Amino acid sequence: MDINKPGWNQSDQQATAYDPNQQQYYGDGSTYYDPDQAVDPNQAYYPDPNTYPDAAAYYGYGQDGQAYPQDYAQDPNQAYYADPNAYQDPNAYTDPNAYVDPNAYQDPNAYVDPNNYTDPNAYYGYGQDGQAYPQDYAQDPNQAYYADPNAYQDPNAYTDPYYVTSTDPNAYYGQVDNVPALEASDLAYEVTPQEQAAEQELFSEPETKVIREIHEFPFEKIRSYFQTDFDSYNSRLTQLKDKLDNAIFSMRKAIDTVKENSANLQIMKQNFERQLKEQQTQRLTSNTDAEKIGAKINQLEERMQRLSRTMESVEWTKKEPRQEQFDPRFVDPRNFNNYVNNTDTMMSMFEKVLMMNLLRSTTPVQPPVQYFTPQPLTASPRPVYEEPISASFRRRGYRGDEFYE
């Protein structure tokens, strides 16, 4: 059909309604559609590559939906990297479920929002307050997870009302404080007695039995029980030692004075003997010599009296020992040495010192064994549903995150 002829009419258009060689489409019969502008409703529409400016360039699409020529787009058989200088719309919608290529290139110099920074190398577990904790708080994901013990417990935190918080062990899932919420659905977890026994056999730990060690015996009670006895022995021994020290000191002093006095008396005796020999040979001329001799004799008598008093005091120390006041509670009635002359004999003193040394040589008080007290769980365990024992296989399919087939 010649589209350059001067005029068309209805009969012309109806005569050539569809030319398969020209791919011409006619709508209502009154409008002529250019084949380049027509859309085949039965086919997917692809833009004509010959209408692009660069017919040889491969056109990928960037993040803003605009086509980028070859220098921005890579080979379509390889990973596609967007234009790094592309404008980032801050209000653009980001699909939270979008696929993230784990091997994608991460620009190390990219700007990091300090309010949204997350350590890409950290393993993120979730603590009791629902916040993610990095590696130092979370354990290996292949092991049991322990929450951060120092985690902040928000008192106003939202708690799932369908968690079993009831203390009733027979409460079904969704019962809160014995107030029934939704009816338990047909898909609620059932655990048969066989499963329960298998779980118990596989995953349970034996009950902890307290085994008393030797250092757990109440040494402290025994020691404090006898402490009063040994305190009394100790004070009495110290008093006895002080008295003996004083007696030894006074006896040594008395012995020194006796030695000194005896030496002086020897000299005086020799002098008097010499004077007597001289007086026997010569006649007394005056009373002065006799007075001097009388004064010397009086002085000598006073010294002898003093010396005898000192010796008497030493003998009194030896003859009259101290009288001990015993508390009958602290005296062993089987030890007769306590009642010999009402004093401590050397044997009983030796026994007491030996007991005190034995007491001091015993092992000191050990701290008690630290047992780990189990901490309460955040959520109650799953309730158990009683089922009749049926000799059949377990229903196939996954049950939660358990390991059963």
Curated annotation (Swiss-Prot):
Keywords assigned: Cell membrane, Membrane, Repeat
| Polar residues composition bias: residue spans | 7-25
Is Cell membrane one of the keywords UniProt gives this record?
A: yes
Q: What cellular-component terms does GO give this entry?
A: plasma membrane
The residue intervals holding the sequence repeats read 40-45, 75-80, 83-87, 89-93, 95-99, 101-105, 107-111, 119-123, 140-145, 148-152, 154-158, 168-172
The highest taxon in the source lineage is Bacteria
Q: Where are the stretches annotated 12 X 5 AA repeats of D-P-N-Q-A-Y?
A: 40-172
Please give the chief subcellular localization of this protein: membrane
What does the record say about its membrane topology?
Peripheral membrane protein
Is Acyltransferase found in the keyword set? no
Q: What is known of its domains?
A: The penta/hexapeptides repeats form a proline-rich acidic domain. In addition, a part of this region contains a perfect direct repeat.
The entry's protein name is Proline-rich P65 protein
Name its species. Mycoplasma pneumoniae (strain ATCC 29342 / M129 / Subtype 1)
Give the gene name.
Answer: p65
